[in-house]
Regions:
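N-terminal subdomain of nucleotide-sugar transferases
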Residues: 1-56
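Active-site proximal beta-strand in glycosyltransferases
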Residues: 4, 93-95, 108-128, 143, ...
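Hydrophobic residues at beta-strand termini and immediately following loops
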Residues: 39, 58-60, 179
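An amphipathic, basic-hydrophobic alpha-helix
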Residues: 62-94, 101-109, 113, 140-149, ...
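Nucleotide-sugar donor phosphate/pyrophosphate-binding loop at the beta->alpha transition
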Residues: 116-117, 126-153, 159, 166, ...
Length: 206
């Protein structure tokens, strides 16, 4: 059975576009007989691990910055325990949603080392704004910095729309194609069925 792991800093029961997109991908993959794991943030008092409708959900400990809008991973004992559990799996594909969270960097780093394929799906079309000139400037510096780090771990980027692909160009990233909210399962299946293992191609040790 093929196995896919999806890193998404935010997920249900938090409601938003990325959360719904992640859920839809997971359900569509599941219908294809694929084993799906979601790695998200433990924003509220939810369990660190549970299985919902056949989908395994790991919730990494985090700081709830900006009232939960910007969950930031806590690299503590609980984090290390959950990551050890994940490293025991053999994933065919790791999908990381968005690229500007610390969670995203964790996802692409994990995917590069422990999965056959490793991709990022972009959801944004502009910089985040908190309507404060100084904080917005700091956000831009941070976003460019973390995107640079993400690019070092992953070279396959997609967008949920053409506008997202164009926004990737702002960071000197050439997006491959779109994976719309409707989810083009043919594209996902093509990724899963490609024979080349990125770890072997780039001599990445486990």
């Amino acid at each position: 059975m093929k196995k896919v792991c999806i890193f998404s800093a935010q997920y249900l029961p938090t409601v938003g576009g990325v959360e719904r997109y992640t859920y839809n991908i997971a359900k569509q993959l599941q219908k294809k007989g694929i084993d799906v794991t979601i790695v998200t943030s433990r924003i509220s008092k939810l369990k660190e691990f549970e299985i919902e409708n056949g989908i395994k959900i790991y919730r990494l400990p985090c700081y709830n910055l900006m009232n939960g809008r910007f969950p930031t991973v806590k690299f503590n004992g609980e984090y290390r325990k959950l990551m050890r559990m994940l490293k025991k799996q053999k994933y065919d594909l790791v999908i990381t949603n968005t690229r500007f969270y610390i969670h995203s960097l964790v996802g692409v780093t994990f995917g590069r080392k422990y999965a056959k394929r490793n991709i990022v799906i972009e959801h944004g079309t502009s910089h985040m704004s908190v309507h404060n000139a100084i904080l917005d400037k700091m956000e831009r510096i941070f976003e460019h910095g973390i995107t640079w780090l993400v690019k070092r771990q992953c070279n396959e980027f997609y967008g949920v729309s053409q506008a997202c692909l164009e926004w990737l160009g702002h960071f000197h990233i050439n997006g491959i194609s779109t994976l719309y909210n409707a989810v083009d399962m043919d594209d996902i299946n093509n990724l899963l069925n490609r024979k080349d293992d990125m770890r072997d191609k780039y001599s990445i040790p486990e």
